[in-house]
């Protein structure tokens, strides 16, 4: 790390912060700054703050980074770097930390003196996060003090001030995405976990912690071997061609190159690539350079050693890369990104640098490891022969006509429209659902292809074997665009390919097989957004003459809350009335309160939590020795089962209170982190209702004397008189219901399949469908308790 520190010699102070312009525009045009206001943009807020923490690690200062998703979907990111500067900026007269969070583009990334390898301008978005957050709190641990500052929708509400002393250093940023801006504010654990794990592979010197208070999950990532362990992870369940994971590292013209790769007994090339910790989904010059360097090294060494004598035609670079899994990670001083998603590296000099580092290393490596070279060459020869065989197989299949243009499978119920952009095809599981779908469809533009036979497990099959399967043959001939290298999107007969399967395990399995097939053999269809999954409803709800279809449990809860909004009210003991939106907000708060209280009890025990709440113990109490003494005395009096001790925590500048339960042999610690947690603060503030309360719904009335019963009672009232049907499969619906819920473009829901995470999907498919039993068993055991319906 000393080497990296020497590349960032300038002091990180207020003068290192450069300001470009003000913040006015961000809330009006958020998509200009974060891409969109949907799920992607929402998570982009986390990446902006996380990237700042990682830049501190890359510069050689941070060793620990933690991300916490709180129960209200707010997020905290903390690092132990230098801490954002708090001194007054010479030009603006404001603290530097205030500039970072209130002035667009104020940051230390414009001048490479402070950060040599930041992700372009990714790290300067703290002000954008602030502008798009309902609230944001920043704490800086620097020079032995804890500095705190708070904002609301980008405006300062709590100026920078000192709240305590500490031996810690670093920055802690907590923020809650603004529901006035975003379509959804639900943070997805899987999305955050994937990014944090990715960063942990790329930064082996840093320990990452991820906590989700909603799910009770806590994960720690520290990968000492870095991207070698990512290669191992991607190859889980696959059989390696040779044991070694080959590692190439080098530096030239300020570009740092780090590559790890291994071959497996498979037919696909997988390359994951990164520049300055940013995933380059579309690859770029660094990937081109690696491919070229690898292919040249293998082909030239094979020719020199006459390893491919039996091959009439020479093998190609593509043959060399069959079965390759590689991770290419580069650090580039001034990266230029291009492509649709701005995730393709365009710097031309990087191609030559990566190619020469790769070629030089491998020629030397293969000299010493002839057995590894021989294994790669034999696999490339096999790939070249298979390529020729596949070509012949496709020609043979075409001659036999099922894939010939214009010849359609007999079971296809086609549509009359000939413009592909207006046509859609439903791939429907089973005969019964297929029959209903044929009756339900709009024949003008909707085609139905029932799939009744066994779909081949394409995990281990090459294209010639895949094409011998009747169901696959029917799909390929119906779509009309060819398969594999021959796929021509201009010949595609339908621009919406919709997978329609049951929500049960069998349906999920068939959907998985179909998705695997598209990923492996027709990836362009997924890349261009032609593949969709139908989302039939889970419930049909009928009340009187009113009948509606509901997608899932969450939507059902929203539906019931809407009923309560219209028909319910609550009056507390002081005759304060709640109705409409105010009542719904109160019920959501009550549910959150109960969930938070249960989480606290699970963490620290009921007696202890009740004591802390009764005596209103707060974070600042632990910084006051007299108050700590008072609290411990009260504990000894009221909680006879515990032995109480205290210990001064120099890092936090506060006391820890430690409880020993000698009967159970357990130890519980109450510290400032627990008392400052969102869950504890939420429960401590409580719900301001005076009991008992009167609950009214339509003509019903009941008196309730417990906060915990109010939400459930309203839900029971809202459900009464409803006829609720839960669907298990498509076959349970008649044609009219199937049309209304799943096929009518005006009322249905479709989910577009994205290829963004093709490598992860590929990995899961391999574990679930590959030949190695042990990884599959481990995967199913790990997830069986967490999922009700296995889905992809």
Curated annotation (Swiss-Prot):
Keywords: ATP-binding, Cytoplasm, DNA-binding, Isomerase, Magnesium, Metal-binding, Nucleotide-binding, Topoisomerase. It comes from Aquifex aeolicus (strain VF5). A type II topoisomerase. Despite its similarity to DNA gyrase, this enzyme is not able to supercoil DNA, and instead acts like topoisomerase IV. Relaxes both positively and negatively supercoiled DNA in an ATP-dependent fashion, decatenates interlocked circles. If this subunit is reconstituted with GyrA from E.coli the hybrid enzyme supercoils relaxed plasmid DNA; if paired with E.coli ParC supercoiling is not restored. This the first bacteria shown to not contain DNA gyrase, although it has 2 copies of a reverse gyrase that introduces positive supercoils. It is an enzyme of class 5 (isomerase). Its EC number is 5.6.2.2. Its main location: cytoplasm. This is Type 2 topoisomerase subunit B. Heterotetramer, composed of two GyrA and two GyrB chains. In the heterotetramer, 'GyrA' contains the active site tyrosine that forms a transient covalent intermediate with DNA, while 'GyrB' binds cofactors and catalyzes ATP hydrolysis. One of its GO terms (cellular component) is DNA topoisomerase type II (double strand cut, ATP-hydrolyzing) complex. SMART domains: HATPase_c, TOP2c. It catalyses: ATP-dependent breakage, passage and rejoining of double-stranded DNA. GO terms for biological process: DNA topological change; DNA-templated DNA replication. SUPFAM superfamilies: ATPase domain of HSP90 chaperone/DNA topoisomerase II/histidine kinase, Ribosomal protein S5 domain 2-like, Type II DNA topoisomerase. It is found in: Cytoplasm. HAMAP family: GyrB. Residues 423-537 form the Toprim domain.
